[in-house]
Amino acid sequence: MLRGTPGLGLGGLNRAEDFVEDLGRSCSEAGRNFGVLRRSSLDEAEEAAGRKRERPTRSKARRMAANVRERKRILDYNEAFNALRRALQHDLGGKRLSKIATLRRAIHRITALSLVLRASPAPRWPCGHLECHGQAAQGSSTGNSSFSVPRSAPSPIAPSLTRRDIASPLVPPTPRCASCSPHSHLGRPRVMAEVPNLAQTSGGNWRQCPGAPPVRPVSWRWGSGLGYQHS
């Protein structure tokens, strides 16, 4: 058979034998590697199965309780969103707002109400919110720290004095009756006060008051109070 093969010599036969030997060695090495891989994969599968067996198994009652809690949480979540949609009073032709759209509308609504409250005057009645009472207490504490006692207002002028009487501090006021006025010492100067039993009428004339005692001469001096003082 080798004789009929054209172009093959001793060199060709040697190369063919070497190729066969290399192929046999590579096949044997591949078989050994395959066996190693198979054993390692089996070991890993056994370890994974062992870990799964070591994990504590949950009972059916615990799984049912967890499912009930999850359903209740989702139900409360949906009820809260439905209440928020009703508070916003949206009108989409029977359609329901999505959760993201509901939250966005709620944010815009709260912002608008905050602006209205800041622009409106202070309420005339006490507020019943605990947050407002806390803010009021803080405001009062800060206000007391910066509060200063106001200065006492000047004493009011005697009610019997009119604007005409106190117009000029240099001229003593004119009493309606020289003998009946409680502030007779604030009458005219000495020139007019020395006239006995006379009182000035509305027309500027002087007359004597009925039943009035004679008026003594009154001396006037300049005082530190409301102009002239009786001496």
Curated annotation (Swiss-Prot):
**How the protein assembles, per its UniProt entry?**
Heterodimer. Efficient DNA binding requires dimerization with another bHLH protein. Interacts with TCF3, TCF4, and TCF12.
Q: Which gene encodes it?
A: Bhlha9
Q: Name one GO molecular function term.
A: protein heterodimerization activity
Matching entries from SUPFAM superfamilies are given as: HLH, helix-loop-helix DNA-binding domain
Q: Which residues form the bHLH domain?
A: 61-113
Keyword Nucleus in the entry? The reply is yes
Record localization:
Nucleus
Swiss-Prot/TrEMBL GO biological process terms = regulation of transcription by RNA polymerase II
Q: Where is the composition biased (Polar residues)?
A: 137-149
Protein name per UniProt: Class A basic helix-loop-helix protein 9
> Pfam families, per this entry?
HLH
Q: Which SMART domains match?
A: HLH
* Swiss-Prot/TrEMBL keywords: Developmental protein, DNA-binding, Nucleus, Transcription, Transcription regulation
Q: Per its database record, what is this protein's job?
A: Transcription factor, which play a role in limb development. Is an essential player in the regulatory network governing transcription of genes implicated in limb morphogenesis.
Q: Name one GO cellular component term.
A: cytoplasm
* Disordered: region residues: 135-168
